[in-house]
Amino acid sequence: MPGRSSTNSGSTRYISFSGVESALSSLKTFQSCISSGMDTVSSVALDLVETQTEVSSEYSMDKAMVEFAKMDRELNHYVKAVQSTINHVKEERPEKVPDLKLLVEKKFLALQDKNSDADFKENEKFVQFKQQLRELKKQYGIHADRENDGIEGMDEDMIVTQSQTNFICPITQLEMKKPVKNKMCGHTYEEEAIVRMIESKHKRKKKACCPKIGCSHTDMRMSDLIPDEALRRAIESHNKKKKRHSE
């Protein structure tokens, strides 16, 4: 990734990193754009499953998500390389200002050389995308060995009856409208109910336990919760079909 820096000589006590830090701020803004792009790809992918729409491999949402994950990794590496270089120069205080651009590029390439597919397992949005896509396909009866055959083998009656108990919030005992999943244990709850429960516990300086009977997760935090888009769509699909049958 290209970068620019001044190579003027002089004592580090006169070096101003304000320009570099401003550029870093801009890069972090771009990170939010990548995050939004991943959200869009995830939403489109779930739409395709829900509407039973086939697309060519050229427009695969999986491929698009991988590209976004690669961009996110590359940008994170570059930001890390710049921050590491700045910290190093501040600590070492060399008599002459080194070639900052060269130092950043060396650190960046060193990080890039360690790239592997396993990195994607650390990308929360990528992992969430794969999990939600898998869950929605499961709700629609699409198995992994049938993914390339579009919606072949889909059984709509199975969609209606499958895992309806998963639609019930363990706190309210009502069907969920805005389900969120606990990243730590995998259980789901109605967002408003679980947020209220966690806040209530924390205000009393107590730990919030997962309300699902038998769950061993005893220290829930707000950061553990993520929207369960796949389950929300499955619930809506079930309710639409139930409404059609009653008309």
Curated annotation (Swiss-Prot):
Principal location class: nucleus
Covalent cross-link Glycyl lysine isopeptide (Lys-Gly) (interchain with G-Cter in SUMO2) as placed by the record, residue numbers: 90, 107, 125, 130
UniProt keyword terms in alphabetical order: Acetylation, Cell cycle, Cell division, Chromosome, DNA damage, DNA recombination, DNA repair, Isopeptide bond, Metal-binding, Mitosis, Nucleus, Phosphoprotein, Telomere, Transferase, Ubl conjugation, Ubl conjugation pathway, Zinc, Zinc-finger
Pathway the protein acts in: Protein modification; protein sumoylation
Binding site for Zn(2+): 185, 187, 210, 215
EC class of the enzyme, as a word: transferase
UniProt GO molecular function: SUMO ligase activity; SUMO transferase activity; ubiquitin-protein transferase activity; zinc ion binding
SUPFAM superfamilies the record matches: RING/U-box
GO cellular component, one term: Smc5-Smc6 complex
Modified residues (N-acetylmethionine): 1
Similarity section: Belongs to the NSE2 family.
Function description: E3 SUMO-protein ligase component of the SMC5-SMC6 complex, a complex involved in DNA double-strand break repair by homologous recombination. Is not be required for the stability of the complex. The complex may promote sister chromatid homologous recombination by recruiting the SMC1-SMC3 cohesin complex to double-strand breaks. Acts as an E3 ligase mediating SUMO attachment to various proteins such as SMC6L1 and TSNAX, the shelterin complex subunits TERF1, TERF2, TINF2 and TERF2IP, RAD51AP1, and maybe the cohesin components RAD21 and STAG2.
Name of the protein this chain belongs to: E3 SUMO-protein ligase NSE2
Organism of this sequence: Rattus norvegicus
